[in-house]
């Protein structure tokens, strides 16, 4: 049996508490399902700065590059607000993305039936929502040059950011979108602003050409990004996989997440290029929520996003689709049973802490795996 190597980077704040619940699930996957996961641990963020003077050490970066996948908790907190910019905790995540060459960011927006009432939208609009936003992560306006503020010499200044995409960047993210759609409902909606942006014109052309060349079996539609934002709120269930660039993906993924009414419960994945020999992609999985330093150490953090990140890892890095399905079903089942951490609790439900929520999900997962 091939080994499955995981690097766990709990990080700061509630990261270690949430990761502790993931370790329980991994232990079960090994002891009862004999899946052979090998885990290593490392430091990232503020705790890495405290130990090494940098947001992630070279040694832990090497571990990340050698692993089949990385599970990442959260970084940052007031303790490190005054550290130098170049070693700030968030830099650890940025270095992981850069050195692992993770260019595809997957942000699911899933509405658990038991939490449909938490959305600001009508239940009939949101119930059963399951869409995936695929954001290009390493190009576009966040990385384009020049990027500067210049003094015009007349009392005025000019801020410059550059939106730039090359054909290969568009083609490779399009490939990921079409591949993902085949495992879902076989539809991709590509969003850009081709009406006012040349990069949008090229994006549209590149996605269209790639579709015709390699993915004609998948349904493709194009939509202007502003119209896409409107449609996300009007009728989100029309979408399956939304493909878009770095800037629009940043905006649209947060809009889609809040449709579910549970931003802090959603996972994400960042994938790199497929290895030419093994076909495997470098990958990092993390909850969407932050480090929540205000509740760290209190035992009340919600571990669902971290556990759901493990489910994404099982699905996309290891092809363990049945196990991923069961773990996601376990999360939904526990919510159906009325078990809630404080952040999602309401009258009539049972309030539990981090450990109790993790134990409940594991028990449900074990029952589904029997």
UniProtKB/Swiss-Prot annotation:
Binds 1 Mg(2+) or Mn(2+) ion per subunit. Keywords: Amino-acid biosynthesis, Branched-chain amino acid biosynthesis, Cytoplasm, Leucine biosynthesis, Magnesium, Manganese, Metal-binding, NAD, Oxidoreductase. It comes from the Bacteria. Pfam families: Iso_dh (PF00180). Its EC number is 1.1.1.85. GO terms for biological process: L-leucine biosynthetic process. It is an enzyme of class 1 (oxidoreductase). The record marks 142, 193 as: Important for catalysis. Gene3D superfamilies: Isopropylmalate Dehydrogenase. Pathway: Amino-acid biosynthesis; L-leucine biosynthesis; L-leucine from 3-methyl-2-oxobutanoate: step 3/4. Its cofactor is Mg(2+); Mn(2+). Mg(2+) binds at residues 226, 250, 254. InterPro entries: IsoCit/isopropylmalate_DH_CS, IsoPropMal-DH-like_dom, Isopropylmalate_DH. GO terms for molecular function: 3-isopropylmalate dehydrogenase activity; magnesium ion binding; NAD binding. It catalyses: (2R,3S)-3-isopropylmalate + NAD(+) = 4-methyl-2-oxopentanoate + CO2 + NADH. Its main location: cytoplasm. Belongs to the isocitrate and isopropylmalate dehydrogenases family. LeuB type 1 subfamily. Homodimer. Catalyzes the oxidation of 3-carboxy-2-hydroxy-4-methylpentanoate (3-isopropylmalate) to 3-carboxy-4-methyl-2-oxopentanoate. The product decarboxylates to 4-methyl-2 oxopentanoate. This is 3-isopropylmalate dehydrogenase. It comes from Brucella melitensis biotype 1 (strain ATCC 23456 / CCUG 17765 / NCTC 10094 / 16M). The gene is leuB.
């Amino acid at each position: 049996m091939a080994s499955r190597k995981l690097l766990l980077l709990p990080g700061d704040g509630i990261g270690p508490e949430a990761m502790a619940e993931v370790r329980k699930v991994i232990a079960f996957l090994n002891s009862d399902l004999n899946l052979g996961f090998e885990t290593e641990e490392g430091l990232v963020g503020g705790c890495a700065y405290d130990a090494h003077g940098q947001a992630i050490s070279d040694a832990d970066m090497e571990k990340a590059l050698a692993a089949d996948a990385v599970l990442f908790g959260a970084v940052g907190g007031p303790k490190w607000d005054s550290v130098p910019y170049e070693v700030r905790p968030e830099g650890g995540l940025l270095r992981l993305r850069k050195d692992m060459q993770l260019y595809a960011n997957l942000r699911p927006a899933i509405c658990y039936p038991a939490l449909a009432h938490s959305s600001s939208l009508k239940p009939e609009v949101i119930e059963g929502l399951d869409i995936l936003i695929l954001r290009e992560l390493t190009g576009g306006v966040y990385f384009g040059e020049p990027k500067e503020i210049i003094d015009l010499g007349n009392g005025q200044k000019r801020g410059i950011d550059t939106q730039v995409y090359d054909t290969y960047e568009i083609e490779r993210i399009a490939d990921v979108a079409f591949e993902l759609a085949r495992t879902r409902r076989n539809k991709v909606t590509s969003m850009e602003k081709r009406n006012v942006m040349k990069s949008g014109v090229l994006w549209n052309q590149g996605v269209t050409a790639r579709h015709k060349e390699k993915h004609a079996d998948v349904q493709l539609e194009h939509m202007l990004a502003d119209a896409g934002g409107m449609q996300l709120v009007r009728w989100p269930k029309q979408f399956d996989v939304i493909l878009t660039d770095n800037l629009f993906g940043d905006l649209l993924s947060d809009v889609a997440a809040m449709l579910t009414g549970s931003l802090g419960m959603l996972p994400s994945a960042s994938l790199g290029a497929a290895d030419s020999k093994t076909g495997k992609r470098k990958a990092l999985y993390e909850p969407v929520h932050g480090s929540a330093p205000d509740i760290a150490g209190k035992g009340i953090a919600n571990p669902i996003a971290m556990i759901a990140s493990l489910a994404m890892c099982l699905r996309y890095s290891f092809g363990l689709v049945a196990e991923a399905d069961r773990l996601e079903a376990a999360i939904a089942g526990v919510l159906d049973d009325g078990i809630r951490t404080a952040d999602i609790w309401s009258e009539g439900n049972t309030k539990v802490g981090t450990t109790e929520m993790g134990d409940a999900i594991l028990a449900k997962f074990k029952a589904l795996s029997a």
